[in-house]
Design a protein with these regions (language model features):
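Short, conserved phosphate-binding/catalytic loop or strand-edge motifs used
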Residues: 3-13
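Proteins with a high burden of low-complexity, intrinsically disordered sequence enriched in S/T/G/P/A and R
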Residues: 1-3, 47
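Second-shell residues forming the walls of enzyme active-site clefts
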Residues: 21-184, 188, 194
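Mid-to-C-terminal alpha-helical segments outside catalytic/metal-binding sites
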Residues: 187-205
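Conserved beta-strand positions that form and line the central face of beta-propeller blades
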Residues: 18
């Protein structure tokens, strides 16, 4: 389910794909979706972490930004993801959306670069895994989207997304090329053996 909040009616994604702009409605509908899917034996993936709907831009075309403060995020999107995790979602989809406030919080210094969540260790590991306690599978949003590679070239982004916390890709651009990027990233040390094994274990689980 799309558990974004439609905070900016100019946003071309959330103004037609969310349960609305009311926090409790989004939580209730998201939990109902997870429950119904579970009853039918279907795994759910909640998206788009860390949350779309603040920016008015489209992450298909660039890396958009969730510009909320940590406190604002905790009270809105953070609350939603806490509830979805508690409700039993098995996967979370990471978005090509940056969140400078939590980058600064975890780094202890001003955020100097816009980094999509799909490439951010701070957002995937420190926020989603450690702070929110999610232990399921993390998947990227579609990697051919422009927002995925706005912070680095694709040869780096492909292995880096796994190294920094995602477990599986959604779509490739070119299967052979992306496989080569992954193997070369492993050989160059961009992707560690420990992280690769962890991702494989989560996929198999």
């Amino acid at each position: 389910p799309v558990v974004d909040l439609d905070q900016n009616y100019h946003n071309p994604i959330t103004n037609v794909r969310t349960f609305g702009d009311d926090l409790q409605t989004v939580i209730d509908m998201g939990k109902a979706y997870i429950k119904a899917a579970e009853e039918e034996g279907v795994a759910t993936s909640v998206k788009h972490f860390p949350g779309d709907g603040v920016d008015e831009r489209d992450q298909h075309l660039l890396t958009s930004v969730n510009s909320l403060s940590c406190e604002e995020w905790d009270a809105t999107y953070g609350k939603i993801y806490e509830e979805m995790i508690e409700a039993g979602t098995l996967t979370v989809m990471a978005a090509h959306i940056a969140m400078p406030a939590y980058e600064e919080y975890f780094d202890g210094k001003p955020c100097e670069k816009i980094i999509p969540a799909t490439l951010s260790k701070n957002l995937m590991i420190h926020l989603l895994r450690e702070k929110l306690g999610f232990n399921g599978l993390i998947t990227t949003d579609a990697t051919p989207m422009v927002g995925f590679c706005s912070a680095s070239d694709r040869a780096t982004a492909v292995p880096l997304s796994i190294e920094n916390g995602c477990d599986v890709f959604l779509f490739n651009r070119n299967m052979e090329e992306d496989y080569r990027f992954m193997t070369e990233g492993y050989e160059k040390g961009i992707l560690s053996e420990a992280r690769l094994k962890e991702a494989v274990k989560r996929i198999l689980a």
